[in-house]
């Protein structure tokens, strides 16, 4: 399983985000962010088959969405790493930044860390201290009901095939570029062979025609 979505926000103002796959993440995230108090806190919300983990510090919320069987320790390791990198990079600028002001830069950081913490299953066993384990025990898990603006019950809808489609497009593009490169390589090789053949024929025929200017073979 993987971390499906990550976002950094100030209250309900999203500053940066990244999604591992397709889904109505923003619609659901807006509902979650509206329920998070502004004081420093750590909490996990449970909704259906998904968990919403967050750390709120200095009014900045670091939140990620995972499957319900994804280890919470790994999720909070991810959030702590994101928090550290975000604070180091932006500091107090985040307190007055406009929506998505950091997205162009920080979304790539979210993507890299999301991939890293999703794939390294042994990460929490190697890096966690006992203090981190004890801290995790103090982070509550609460069930949460989400309601859309229409008043309907809001469910998190995820399309993991979008990630597969992106991978397929990347593979096709790479294959196309490789084929084009091979074609150019073969064309260059063919041209070189033709040039060498012409030079070789010229050298062989020149003595028979009286020299390099072919005086005996070319009519004046």
Swiss-Prot record:
Instruction: Enumerate the UniProt keywords alphabetically.
Output: Acetylation, Coiled coil, Cytoplasmic vesicle, Endoplasmic reticulum, Endosome, Exocytosis, Golgi apparatus, Lysosome, Membrane, Phosphoprotein, Protein transport, Signal-anchor, Synapse, Synaptosome, Transmembrane, Transmembrane helix, Transport
Is DNA damage among this UniProt entry's keywords? no
- Pull the Vesicular topological domain ranges from the record: 210-220
- Bilayer topology: Single-pass type IV membrane protein
Q: What Pfam families would the database entry show?
A: Longin (PF13774), Synaptobrevin (PF00957)
> InterPro entries from the xrefs?
Longin-like_dom_sf (IPR011012), Longin_dom (IPR010908), Synaptobrevin-like (IPR001388), Synaptobrevin-like_transport (IPR051097), V_SNARE_CC (IPR042855)
Membrane spanning stretches: 189-209
Q: Chief localization class?
A: membrane
Tell me which parts of the chain lie in the Cytoplasmic compartment: 2-188
| A single BP term in Gene Ontology | protein transport
- v-SNARE coiled-coil homology domain mapped to chain residues: 125-185
Q: What PROSITE patterns does this protein map onto?
A: LONGIN, SYNAPTOBREVIN, V_SNARE
Biological role stated in the UniProt entry? Involved in the targeting and/or fusion of transport vesicles to their target membrane during transport of proteins from the early endosome to the lysosome. Required for heterotypic fusion of late endosomes with lysosomes and homotypic lysosomal fusion. Required for calcium regulated lysosomal exocytosis. Involved in the export of chylomicrons from the endoplasmic reticulum to the cis Golgi. Required for exocytosis of mediators during eosinophil and neutrophil degranulation, and target cell killing by natural killer cells.
Quaternary structure annotation from Swiss-Prot or TrEMBL: Component of the SNARE complex composed of STX4, SNAP23 and VAMP7 that binds SYT7 during lysosomal exocytosis. Component of the SNARE complex composed of STX7, STX8, VAMP7 and VTI1B that is required for heterotypic fusion of late endosomes with lysosomes. May interact with STX17. Interacts with PICALM. Interacts with RAB21.
UniProt similarity note? Belongs to the synaptobrevin family.
Spell out the protein name for this chain.
Vesicle-associated membrane protein 7
Q: Please give the organism.
A: Bos taurus
């Amino acid at each position: 399983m993987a971390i499906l979505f990550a976002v950094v926000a100030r209250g309900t103002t999203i500053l940066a985000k990244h999604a591992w796959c397709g889904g109505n993440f923003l619609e659901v995230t807006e509902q979650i962010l509206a329920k998070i108090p502004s004081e420093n806190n750590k909490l996990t919300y449970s909704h259906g088959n998904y968990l919403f983990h967050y750390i709120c510090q200095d009014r900045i919320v670091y939140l990620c969405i995972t499957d319900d069987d994804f280890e919470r320790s790994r999720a909070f390791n991810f959030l702590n790493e994101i928090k550290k990198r975000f604070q180091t990079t932006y500091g107090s600028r985040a307190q007055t930044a406009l929506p998505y002001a950091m997205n162009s830069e920080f979304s790539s950081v979210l993507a890299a860390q999301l991939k890293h913490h999703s794939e390294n299953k042994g990460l929490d066993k190697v890096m966690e201290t006992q203090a981190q384990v004890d801290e995790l025990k103090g982070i509550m898990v609460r069930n949460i009901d989400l309601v859309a603006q229409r008043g309907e019950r809001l469910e998190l809808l995820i399309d993991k095939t979008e990630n597969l489609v992106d991978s397929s497009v990347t593979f096709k593009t790479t294959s196309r570029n490789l084929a084009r490169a091979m074609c150019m390589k073969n064309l260059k090789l063919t041209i070189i062979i033709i040039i060498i053949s012409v030079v070789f024929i010229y050298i062989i025929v020149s003595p028979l025609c009286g020299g390099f200017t072919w005086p005996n073979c070319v009519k004046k």
